[in-house]
Amino acid sequence: MRFTMEEIISFTETWIVKGDLNPDMLADDFQFISPFWKSNNKAVFLEKFLDPTEYVRLSLSNITKFDPYLNFKGLDGKHFSMILQYFTKNGSNVWEAVLGKVENGMLVELRSIYDLEATKKAHGLK
C-alpha cells in the first residue's frame, strides 16, 4: 500500500496529537529518532507506540493544547516538517520540530527535535 504525502502528514499529525498510529504508512526500514524515546527501528517503534497507553500516559495526558501546529511539505516531494508548540498542565510550554522522510509512498524516517530537559520539566519527569 502506498500513500500520498498529504496522507502521511495527516497520519503523523494524528499520531502526535492523539496517539492513534497507522502502522500501514511505515516502510519496512522505518527509523524513529527522538531524544526521549531514543532511536528505534520499525519493530521497536511499533512495540512502543501501536498501543498508545504509555505515550498517552507520559506525554499526551499532560498536554493541554497545541498552538501553533504548522505543517510544511518539501519542494522535493520527499520531506515534510511539523513545527509545533504545546502547553502542559504545569504551565510549561515546549517547541518541537518533527521531520519526516517519505520514499515510494511510505514513511522511512521520523525525527523529533526538542530540548530534552525542557520536555522532562514540562511533563514532570526527572
Mark where each language-model region is:
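C-terminal and inter-domain tail/linker signature
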Residues: 1-126
